């Protein structure tokens, strides 16, 4: 009876079906043996009451679903002709623990042969389509998408057979799609989002779009960055320390060499001072050859070496602020004068206007503050290094004093004769082919100019320049005030004490004049003597 009721509900006439009404059609007498036949039904009650013929025609054929269409295709063996694309590598299941073998447990048939061949291509792991197959029957769930829609053009080499060198290519990729085992049914515990490198081999040089997440090869190491606690400026600081230590070693070696060369020059006459002797070249200490030099050449070379060492020990003249101007615009007013403006209820044009100070005073204070900040930030010279520097400077001054004293004595000795004898202090000197061997006065003038300029630069670097007695240019004097490495007061005091012990005529002259009266006054006297003999 239930079956007959189903037939009543499903065998509606055309009129009731068009009006979407319930159609009740009882069975004809003797038609119980064939309940599925629509012709065995009587006209429905609604058509009988309306007096219209009750007609029941066959409905149009229903469209097949995608699952039914695919089932029909697989039944006639058309699955092999579909343009399937590789979805999962063949070796993906072999690297998973517990997967058994790399080969699939499903026997190869004509229906799944194309899928097994296409799955052997190595590529980027995308979301594969789970296949639930038993034997040769292929069944797909209604919720699953068809294989044709799931296939994507991700293989850059076409649909042909993949190259064999890509099967073992390492691929460090973050799997954003789960891995499914072909031997086990699909389950949630089969999802694997771990990073799993493939076995051995080098990265391919082509097909880079397959390895979108490749970082580094196993044979390559990423560039090492700064570790925890390591500063980016450690290397620069280490280089500065190495340069400073090298300058200190050179300074110590120069001090001992100056003592060896100029310790006994006070009692030596001028011909012996001007005589050449083999001496080690200080500008190229690595060379084993010796070059002939006299005392003048050694003093000039030692002065150049000493000046080079002072440049290495000098502080870095980088400004502490990013502004390149001498004074800041914010120095022209005071912040305290703007505070009462907002608190006053009445406006006062006299009191509310800030009083600008003198710009020259502010620039001077700003420059003094910058110099103090620079001196505070620069590394200081310790007392042993200061004494070593002043010792080298004293040896050089003593050598210059000895040389020019002997030259001045030779000039004074020749004043009694009609033709004064001027010693050739720079023999073999030529300027553009012009020989100075017969012009001894020009040789002495050149030596004075060169020695005075060298002493000015050294004293400027030390910070002990006497501006009144110095012949240095204005730019050198300004540079000496800004780039000195020693404290001017303490260095001048030590030098004055050293020179007062050796020069009795300058003991009554306090200050820097005692130090300048020994060498520079002799240079002035020599120039005056040369002017008289012209």
From Swiss-Prot:
Low complexity bias spans: 361-378
InterPro entries according to UniProt: Zn2-C6_fun-type_DNA-bd_sf, Zn2Cys6_DnaBD
Transmembrane segments: none
Polar residues bias: start-end ranges: 109-125
Domain of life: Eukaryota
Chief site of localization: nucleus
Subcellular location(s) of the protein: Nucleus
Protein name as catalogued: Cytochalasin cluster regulator ccsR
Native organism taxonomy: Eukaryota, Fungi, Dikarya, Ascomycota, Pezizomycotina
Gene: ccsR
């Amino acid at each position: 009876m239930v079956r007959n009721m189903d037939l009543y509900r499903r065998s509606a006439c055309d009129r009731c079906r068009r009006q979407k009404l319930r159609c009740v059609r009882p069975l004809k007498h003797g038609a119980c043996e064939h309940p599925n036949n629509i012709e065995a039904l009587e006209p429905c009650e609604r058509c009988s009451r309306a007096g219209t013929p009750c007609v029941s025609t066959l409905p149009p054929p229903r469209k097949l679903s995608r699952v039914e269409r695919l089932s029909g295709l697989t039944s006639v063996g058309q699955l092999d002709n579909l343009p399937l694309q590789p979805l999962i590598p063949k070796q993906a299941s072999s690297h998973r623990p517990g997967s058994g073998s790399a080969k699939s447990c499903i026997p190869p048939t004509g229906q799944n042969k194309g899928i097994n061949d296409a799955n052997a291509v190595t590529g980027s792991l995308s979301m594969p389509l789970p296949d639930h197959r038993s034997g040769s029957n292929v069944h797909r769930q209604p919720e699953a998408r068809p294989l044709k829609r799931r296939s994507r053009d991700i293989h850059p080499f076409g649909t042909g057979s993949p190259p064999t060198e890509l099967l073992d290519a390492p691929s460090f990729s973050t799997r954003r799609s789960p891995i499914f085992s072909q031997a086990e049914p699909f389950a949630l515990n089969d999802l694997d989002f771990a990073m799993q490198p493939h076995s051995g081999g080098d990265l391919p040089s082509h097909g880079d779009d397959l390895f979108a997440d490749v970082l580094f090869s196993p044979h390559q190491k990423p560039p090492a960055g700064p570790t925890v606690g390591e500063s980016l400026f450690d290397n620069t600081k280490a280089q500065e320390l190495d340069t400073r230590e090298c300058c200190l070693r050179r300074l110590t070696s120069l001090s001992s060499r100056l003592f060896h060369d100029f310790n006994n020059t006070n009692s030596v006459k001028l011909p012996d001072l001007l005589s050449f002797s083999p001496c080690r070249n200080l500008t190229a200490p690595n060379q084993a050859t010796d070059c002939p030099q006299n005392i003048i050449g050694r003093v000039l070379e030692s002065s150049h070496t000493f000046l080079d060492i002072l440049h290495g020990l000098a502080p870095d003249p980088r400004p502490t602020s990013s502004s390149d101007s001498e004074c800041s615009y914010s120095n022209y007013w005071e912040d305290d004068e703007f505070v009462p403006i907002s608190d006053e209820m009445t406006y006062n044009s006299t009191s509310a206007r800030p009083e600008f100070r003198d710009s020259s005073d502010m620039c001077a204070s700003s420059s003094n503050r910058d110099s103090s900040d620079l001196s505070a930030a620069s590394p200081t010279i310790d007392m042993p290094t200061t004494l070593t520097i002043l010792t080298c400077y004293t040896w050089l001054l003593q050598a210059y004093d000895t040389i020019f004293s002997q030259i001045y004595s030779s000039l004074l000795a020749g004043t009694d004769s009609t033709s004064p004898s001027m010693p050739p202090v720079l023999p073999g000197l030529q300027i553009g082919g012009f020989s100075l061997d017969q012009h001894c006065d020009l040789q002495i003038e050149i030596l004075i100019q060169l020695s005075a300029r060298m002493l000015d630069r050294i004293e400027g670097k030390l910070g002990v320049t006497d501006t009144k007695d110095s012949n240095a240019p204005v730019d050198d004097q300004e540079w000496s005030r800004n780039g000195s490495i020693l404290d001017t007061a303490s260095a001048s005091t030590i030098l004055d004490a050293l020179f007062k012990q050796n020069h009795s005529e300058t003991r009554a002259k306090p200050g820097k004049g005692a130090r300048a009266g020994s060498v520079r006054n002799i240079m002035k006297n020599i120039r005056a003597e040369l002017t008289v003999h012209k």
